[in-house]
Design a protein with these regions (language model features):
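Long, distal/terminal scaffolding or interaction modules
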Residues: 1-146
Length: 146
């Protein structure tokens, strides 16, 4: 998903380091990246727009590496885990996803479910955490808007 500007990528298993780096929305195009397993460090680095979902299926540990959202100034990251993300950069806010948040990504989760034969009950069996840029984010002022 490097510098992705639109479209969807669905990964059944794991992804490596710097997954989703430099993703950015462009006009009506919103990139979507879904990882069924876990990711390495620097997930969503410099994320400027779009949606990243990490499901951590068959994972007991937190399914993302270190430095999640470093340089993030747009977009959203959803991480499925019963363990809250820790050691996030100051420009990233984390909240436990509410029903309204899940309803926004439900069609993407259903698409993943259909593609890979993973039951929605399994996907929804753990909590999701929603990561967004901090409104007081010092990075946003360094970038131009679309």
């Amino acid at each position: 998903g490097y510098a992705m500007r639109g479209g969807k990528i669905f990964v059944k298993g794991n992804a490596g380091y710097r997954t989703g780096i430099h993703m950015k929305e462009y006009k009506d195009k919103k990139p979507v990246l879904v990882v069924g397993g876990n990711t390495g460090s620097f997930l969503g680095e410099y994320l400027a727009g779009g949606l990243i979902i990490v499901l951590g299926l068959e994972e007991d540990e937190f399914p993302a590496g270190n430095f999640v959202g470093t340089g993030m100034h747009g977009g959203e990251i959803y991480i499925r885990s019963n363990k809250e993300p820790k050691n996030l950069p100051k420009q990233v806010c984390v909240n436990k996803a509410e029903k309204e948040d899940i309803s926004k990504i439900e069609n993407i989760l259903e698409e993943f479910s259909s593609l890979f034969g993973v039951a929605m009950e399994e996907i929804l069996s753990k909590s999701f955490y929603r990561l967004t840029p901090n409104a007081k984010n010092p990075y946003k002022q360094l970038y131009t808007e679309n």
